[in-house]
Amino acid sequence: MKPRAECCSPKFWLVLAVLAVSGSRARSQKSPPSIGIAVILVGTSDEVAIKDAHEKDDFHHLSVVPRVELVAMNETDPKSIITRICDLMSDRKIQGVVFADDTDQEAIAQILDFISAQTLTPILGIHGGSSMIMADKDESSMFFQFGPSIEQQASVMLNIMEEYDWYIFSIVTTYFPGYQDFVNKIRSTIENSFVGWELEEVLLLDMSLDDGDSKIQNQLKKLQSPIILLYCTKEEATYIFEVANSVGLTGYGYTWIVPSLVAGDTDTVPSEFPTGLISVSYDEWDYGLPARVRDGIAIITTAASDMLSEHSFIPEPKSSCYNTHEKRIYQSNMLNRYLINVTFEGRNLSFSEDGYQMHPKLVIILLNKERKWERVGKWKDKSLQMKYYVWPRMCPETEEQEDDHLSIVTLEEAPFVIVESVDPLSGTCMRNTVPCQKRIVSENKTDEEPGYIKKCCKGFCIDILKKISKSVKFTYDLYLVTNGKHGKKINGTWNGMIGEVVMKRAYMAVGSLTINEERSEVVDFSVPFIETGISVMVSRSNGTVSPSAFLEPFSADVWVMMFVMLLIVSAVAVFVFEYFSPVGYNRCLADGREPGGPSFTIGKAIWLLWGLVFNNSVPVQNPKGTTSKIMVSVWAFFAVIFLASYTANLAAFMIQEEYVDQVSGLSDKKFQRPNDFSPPFRFGTVPNGSTERNIRNNYAEMHAYMGKFNQRGVDDALLSLKTGKLDAFIYDAAVLNYMAGRDEGCKLVTIGSGKVFASTGYGIAIQKDSGWKRQVDLAILQLFGDGEMEELEALWLTGICHNEKNEVMSSQLDIDNMAGVFYMLGAAMALSLITFICEHLFYWQFRHCFMGVCSGKPGMVFSISRGIYSCIHGVAIEERQSVMNSPTATMNNTHSNILRLLRTAKNMANLSGVNGSPQSALDFIRRESSVYDISEHRRSFTHSDCKSYNNPPCEENLFSDYISEVERTFGNLQLKDSNVYQDHYHHHHRPHSIGSASSIDGLYDCDNPPFTTQPRSISKKPLDLGLPSSKHSQLSDLYGKFSFKSDRYSGHDDLIRSDVSDISTHTVTYGNIEGNAAKRRKQQYKDSLKKRPASAKSRREFDEIELAYRRRPPRSPDHKRYFRDKEGLRDFYLDQFRTKENSPHWEHVDLTDIYKEQSDDFKRDSVSGGGPCTNRSHLKHGAGDKHGVVSGVPAPWEKNLSNVDWEDRSGGNFCRSCPSKLHNYSTAVTGQNSGRQACIRCEACKKAGNLYDISEDNSLQELDQPAAPVAVPSNAPSTKYPQSPTNSKAQKKTRNKLRRQHSYDTFVDLQKEEAALAPRSVSLKDKGRFLDGSPYAHMFETPAGESTFANHESSVAAAGHRHHNNPGGGGYMLSKSLYPDRVTQNPFIPTFGDDQCLLHGSKSYFFRQPTVAGAPKARPDFRALVTNKPVVSALHGAVPGRFQKDICIGNQSNPCVPNNKNPRAFNGSSNGHVYEKLSSIESDV
């Protein structure tokens, strides 16, 4: 019994109680902490909905669980509210309160703020009076409101006004707390805004004074603005609206905007509130009371959970409202920081420092005609979204006065209405634009999305609307039409702008609205403010430039007149004036002189005028006569104007012409039958407009065809035109003209420069039977009367393509632009080719018959051509000599040929120095046939085999066998070469002299066809003068196979035979050529030195000077001749012109360098010269000559080379001018084409120096010692040329040295150093032409000690020696100046080979020496080798001795012998070209 008693002892029960308490505490510690929240609802709130909201398991994720106490109250007095909250704190241990009421008493918020500040308990006012604006809260209060602050509501009110462009407003407020914040916010916003706000009045009403309505009425009467902002309580607002209604401020035209404080409970609307009142309110529709309660609980719970997570505790519940510990204050302040920043379910539920929501859900409500609050807008995320794009004007139904604020619809169509976006900075429209709303039509649109977007409109119609509204005094709201375009009746219902007016949604329709009969039945139209109609727009297409575009700057008449004036009038006039001028070019004909002198022909006149027209720097011959000069000056003035006009207009015609489709009208074939064209013509318009209606009513087929090409808008149509998808666009003319004027690149044009079909106009559509029509018509007519309509048209309707010229863009001209010029050149080339072929056919086949050769009589065509030739070239043809001198008579009349031959022989016998040779003319006369220059009748005599004549034996008859040779020669002459009949070089302005270029000096020109066109290909075995006569019997018809001159020397009388450039404008000095000789001698020297261009010098003057020089006598009486076999000499000459294939052309050779040994050997050789007939034994073949060459006395021109030099050069390829060996030419080439390398030069010599390189010709060696004597082989003849020490010294002294450039002023001061070469005889007439004191006054005087022409026995070598080396002789110093080195030296005297080219200050001569392969080397002297040549005396009479130069003999294939034994230094700056002397180097350099 005892143990049982112990089990049931009191200690046992105590242990069990302790364990139970411990278990309960353990379980309590495991559950999350909770916070007590009281939800107090005042009034008839939906408690069931609230209970469901907070019982949902929405807070399980939080670390603190809310413990909600739901309390319902009916009393709203302060005592009841305070008592109930304090009881809950003490009984339920609550830690937060969520308060909601259904009253409009803002005092509840003040009571709640007081309780929160005293108890440090967070209280949330979520609805009713508890959420109304409370301006000044206690600093220690934790009272938060679900509503916007005063500043937030003020900003929303300004946004509403900005949305509808209500910029003029006033403010009315009472002394309710927060009014200052409201006014300050408004002022600060409008001051810092880009919008042009205008705050007219700010009224502060004192509602505490009980003095009746008089004071408030007087203050409200000051208001004139249509928009009024009111800040007060709901009760105060009721009284203010009552007074405002009495003064007429609540009627139509006035809009009141109030905050949520005034609206209060939306379920109760005071009767004093005017219809159309706008309020900013908390969202009661989308954010109801259950959602607010739930968010209130979540805010307190989330803040406590965040505090627990960071600080591990939550505020302790307060047991009483009357005592507050410091620990409680600390915890409450900490919880307050978490309440401000709360985010729940992704929504920002934060509060500001003032206790208002940072992102409240606000709505804009409107008191409609049913006296109910209608939500018309929403404020969300700082953006306003309104329901109405045009604010509906609400007015009481009792008011029947007409509205002066109109709703106007428009349509975007530039330039009449242009729509732009608002300014991104201010969000408003800029100046000169009008706000317009664009409705958004979307099937998926929700209520939260706005029904429109704000735009800005401007344009021609908008400016007219602004002026009309100002004149008629009405305001308007503008919006853009969305259901259609201008207006079309579909199924009995109108759409577009007409439909808006018909349905009375808009009072007016302004835009590009065409007036037509169908529309006029349903609406009224104003008078048209612009004329329009139907027009057609097309696109320009790039065309092509006409090939004759370069001729289009002038018409065909102008071109014809220009050429007529040039060829017929002006050129003939200049020619006639010059021909009959006493000082003209043809004065020699008037003086009775010999015809053939220089003349100014019609061809030269045409060439002169042509060059002046086109500014070509061509060589022309200017007239001398005063009358002709005046005529040319006038023509030059005409040429300037002509060319300037052509150049100025050329660019415009070279631009590609653009093609535009031409359409005559809507009845054009392209519109009525578009399929007849390929491709079919495509056109369209914009549907639902007056243009489509007009086409549909009048052209049914056209309307049916264009349906597939219709465009959605004007912009789409323009793009289709540019891309080629559309050929034509039919639309209103006013719109198309504007688009064409503003098109980029001006590619779009309207046909006929804006041609209009079916003319009509644009008008303003007004509701039917409206009282505004008359006032609008008068306003439009007033705009026309004041000229403002024209200003608007110039501003909006005139484009850059209409008003301004397009800027010409710089661009490159392609081949299409210049095609015509190239076509012209191609045609000219083809015509030239045809002319070339015809010329050759006529020349080689038909001209002989026309010349009378076939019939033996001069033909009529020939006579006419000679007459024309005489007229053009100024050559007089004597009637008595025409038959005698004609080529036909020369070819067919044997008697005349013999007479002409004898006359030529006589002239040659009387002249010495033929072609510059020191021999007598008789030395050239031989038995072979000769050719008379029958073209120019200049009595020039040339051998038929083109050889110089080797003197026959002394006993031979001088003219043996001449008669038979002439008969044989002229009888068998075949006329196949024009050069037989005409001397190209001396075509018509040279006297008939033996010194002409057709004489023998032309045969050795490097450019002569016998040396260049068909050079002889020499066989390995040299020629032998002892060939059988059968070898020469085949040469009787040789004269028709070669020409004496190449085309290079084709005759033009401007080609002066001197080394002056024909195009040079420099001058040379002359003595006066004409006039009395006595008078000329009295004149001063400088007065006699007339200046004239080189191209204007008389050809006769030069030829007479040249002729005088060539008549110079031999130098000494010991002049000797060396005769060779006549037959061999003839063979040698014939070989020069024998046509050979594969024979190279001759090259230019520089023979400037002269050896010292040349003069020395020359002097030594001349000591033992043989007699005239002694050298015939030397023509025999020697036994040691492998090739049949007989050793003999060397010719006088082979005097300066040693045997060693010759042996070295005969076996290899060496430079012509220096001893450099050419390694790039093989011996094989030498054997095959030996004639080509005879004048080959090295690169250094080719590149050596230019014309002005003075040191180039001064590079000659000066050797004071004479050449060492050389051994003479035993088989060589003993004849040597005599040489004296005196001559050697003289040669050193006068050896050719290059002088520097002399100016003209130094000529007179130069001392006379050497005597000039005097002619044998000079006529007094010619001698008088040279003035005393001029540089050429003593040119024809014979120096002292000069031998006459009497002695023919002196050797050529001695003569040549004296020519150069005799101090008293006339040797010339080589100078690069045009002017002479001495006053007695004439630079214009043609020397030997004057037709040859000038290379670096010296003449180049082209003579070749035959290659001797394996020649005997027994004699070291070069004279022994040269003696074996059969052609040593070939150039005996042709080479003047005054040029001590190395020569290549004949047309043989051996290399030429250089004068300089040292290789010439390569001058890299030289180009190696051949230069002609300029008229004055000094003035050029």
Swiss-Prot record:
Binding sites annotated in the UniProt record for L-glutamate: T514, R519, S690, T691, D732
Modification sites for Phosphotyrosine: Y962, Y1039, Y1109, Y1133, Y1155, Y1475
Subunit (UniProt): Heterotetramer. Forms heterotetrameric channels composed of two GluN1/zeta subunits (GRIN1), and two identical GluN2/epsilon subunits (GRIN2A, GRIN2B, GRIN2C or GRIN2D) or GluN3 subunits (GRIN3A or GRIN3B) (in vitro). Can also form heterotetrameric channels that contain at least two GluN1 subunits and at least two different GluN2 subunits (or a combination of one GluN2 and one GluN3 subunits) (in vitro). In vivo, the subunit composition may depend on the expression levels of the different subunits. Found in a complex with GRIN1, GRIN3A and PPP2CB. Found in a complex with GRIN1 and GRIN3B.
Keyword Disulfide bond: yes
Transmembrane stretches, start-end: 558-576, 631-646, 818-837
Compartments, as annotated in UniProt: Cell membrane; Postsynaptic cell membrane; Cell projection, Dendrite; Late endosome
Feature: compositional bias, Low complexity: 1269-1278
Gene designation per UniProt: GRIN2B
Keyword field contains Ion transport: yes
CDD domains (UniProt xref): PBP1_iGluR_NMDA_NR2 (cd06378), PBP2_iGluR_NMDA_Nr2 (cd13718)
InterPro entries from the UniProt entry: ANF_lig-bd_rcpt, Glu/Gly-bd, Iono_Glu_rcpt_met, Ionotropic_Glu_rcpt, Iontro_rcpt_C, NMDAR2_C, Peripla_BP_I
Protein family per UniProt: Belongs to the glutamate-gated ion channel (TC 1.A.10.1) family. NR2B/GRIN2B subfamily.
Intramembrane region ranges (chain numbering): 604-623
Site (Functional determinant of NMDA receptors): N615
GO molecular function terms listed in the Swiss-Prot or TrEMBL record: glutamate binding; glutamate-gated calcium ion channel activity; NMDA glutamate receptor activity; transmitter-gated monoatomic ion channel activity involved in regulation of postsynaptic membrane potential; zinc ion binding
The record's account of how the chain is modified after translation: Phosphorylated on tyrosine residues. Phosphorylation at Ser-1303 by DAPK1 enhances synaptic NMDA receptor channel activity.
Superkingdom field: Eukaryota
GO CC terms of this entry: cytoskeleton; dendrite; late endosome; lysosome; NMDA selective glutamate receptor complex; plasma membrane; postsynaptic density; postsynaptic density membrane
Listed GO biological process terms: calcium ion transmembrane import into cytosol; excitatory postsynaptic potential; long-term synaptic potentiation; protein heterotetramerization; synaptic transmission, glutamatergic
Region feature Disordered, mapped onto this chain: 1074-1097, 1162-1194, 1269-1302
Protein name, entry field: Glutamate receptor ionotropic, NMDA 2B
